[in-house]
Amino acid sequence: CPVGRVTVAMLAQKIRQVLGLSLKWFVKNGRSLSAEDAFATLRGCCENAGVVVMLNGIVGDNTHRPLDAQEFRAFALIDEYAPLIFINRTDSRRGQLFSLAHEIAHIWVGAEEIYNDTYHYASNAPVEVLCNAVAAELLIPRSLFNERWQDAVRNCIDAPDAVEVLAREFPVSQVVIARRALDGMMISEQEYQSIVDKSRRHWDVQKTSGGSGGNYYNTKQSRLDHRFLERLAASVSEGRTSYEEAYRLTGSNRKTFPKILDSMGERGR
């Protein structure tokens, strides 16, 4: 849709309708979902709506060639039948969630791009401004944010503390919360920049600490669109797709392909 003909609220509402999301979709049993669970929920809704979502943090299967989140966080490819979103999983969990929401907005707008705004969304490009605003509206609806911010203010919490509190109530980073507050003229530019700088230092420490590589097969199948894997498995079993082609499409082989499918089944139960 043309950028100038749609408002943030209109586009966010259209996306919620198609994906089957409520205004508080990220709240379950009175508590906010973790960024990881919110991502899984939003990804599942995308897949059900026909949007392919794939993740990877390395080049192919080469663990010695990580994708740099400083260079790009995500991208979207627009297609009438199978739009695709790719997420760089070296980014933080909350960063991945915001990137997914941002790319969803791009698909609705109909504009392809590579998203690499690492710490705060300050692009002046009209499409980027719109998509960042829509992503924020999907993850932190303005009406809910204003209500919770006022509650924090009434409890005499200063701006940095209020940002920290709200970052526990919404599945987004403190930077995104702070930007929401800045856009609403609730904090100053100086306060916002201080939060950005603090978050940057914290993320740099997290990156250097590293972590476990996890289960290979769980990691492998989580990179691929679940709907794609299900249909590929069905096509192979029906003889419409050869095993060699399935191996090529999934970057697997005779030994690993069945285990990837088994891992998908276990995670689906």
Tell me the role of every PLM-derived stretch.
Residues 1-269:
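Active-site hotspot residues in diverse enzymes, especially metal/ion-binding acidic/histidine motifs
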